Amino acid sequence: MSNLWRNLKSVRLPFRRAPTLPLYNVPVRRSISSSSSIPPSSSPPPRLTITQRVKELTKKYGWWSLGVYIGISVLDFSASFVLVRTLGAERIGYLEHSILNSIRRYFNWEIPESTASGEPEAYHSSIWTELAFAYGIHKALVVARVPLTAAIVPPLAKRFRGPRIRP
């Protein structure tokens, strides 16, 4: 009889299952209760400064954001310079002339004599003064360059990176 019992133990019958612990058979279900959830904050997140926005954009999109920002900056500065050169060369020349004369008077330097005839003096600004004015306008437009960069970079990066790579 002992041989028969050993043979029956070694035979695997279809109705016989391996023993399992009841803990592993029960599916784990977690309920979401209102007490464990994070309460919604009543205050909106703080607004980021321009520098923080640029850093965040650079972290997310890398060289794409830097390239777009530099491209917009080049266009912005060149447009500012063209506007200063065409629209305000004589006005800037007058300002430059009056500022330089004030400095010369302050330090008792020799002031160049104006034209002897009764013709009005033509004021010509130097290229460096025009560049300085264009740079001032360019710096004032930083509040427009950053949002424009933030609007252009995501679709541009998505288009050129391809559909499989997330930005």
From Swiss-Prot:
InterPro entries: FAM210A/B-like (IPR045866), FAM210A/B-like_dom (IPR009688)
GO CC annotations on file: mitochondrion
One BP term from GO: protein maturation
Residues annotated as transmembrane: none
Family stated for the protein in its record: To A.thaliana At2g20940.
Record-given protein name: Uncharacterized protein C106.07c
Organism: Schizosaccharomyces pombe (strain 972 / ATCC 24843) (Fission yeast)
